[in-house]
Amino acid sequence: MAKTNLKTLARAKRISRIRKKISGTSERPRLRVFKSNKHIYAQIIDDASGKSLVAMSTVDKQFDLGDESGKTAAAKKVGVVLAERATAAGIKKVIFDRGGYIYHGRVKSLSEGAREGGLDF
C-alpha cells in the first residue's frame, strides 16, 4: 500500500489557501509557476475566462539557455522570455502565484527574470 507524501499534501493545502485569495482577471492575470526536479513551467492565466494566455517552460522548443548552465539560470531565462511573450500579447501587470513553493531559488529567479523582462507585480 502506497504511503502519501507529506510534502505533497502540505503543498496542496498551501495551493488551496493561496487560490482562495488570488484570482487573475483579464486586466491583471495570474502568473503561475510549477517546478519539477528537472524543469520549470510558467504560464499566465485569466481565471475569469479560465484560459491560459501565455506560457513558457524549459521544455519549450524555443527555449535556449545559451552559454549559461544550471536550473536557476534556466528559470531566469524562462521568466525573461515569458515577459517578452506577455508584452507582445499586451499584458503588463500580473499577479504572481508561486504555486505553494517558497520564494527562493528557481521561483525567485523566474520572478526576477519576469520583472527584468518588463512585467509588473
UniProtKB/Swiss-Prot annotation:
Coiled coil: none annotated. One of its GO terms (biological process) is translation. GO terms for molecular function: 5S rRNA binding; structural constituent of ribosome. CDD domains: Ribosomal_L18_L5e. It comes from the Bacteria. SUPFAM superfamilies: Translational machinery components (SSF53137). InterPro entries: Ribosomal_uL18_bac-type (IPR004389), Ribosomal_uL18_bac/euk (IPR005484). Keywords: Ribonucleoprotein, Ribosomal protein, RNA-binding, rRNA-binding. One of its GO terms (cellular component) is cytosolic large ribosomal subunit. Part of the 50S ribosomal subunit; part of the 5S rRNA/L5/L18/L25 subcomplex. Contacts the 5S and 23S rRNAs. Belongs to the universal ribosomal protein uL18 family. This is one of the proteins that bind and probably mediate the attachment of the 5S RNA into the large ribosomal subunit, where it forms part of the central protuberance. This is Large ribosomal subunit protein uL18. The gene is rplR.
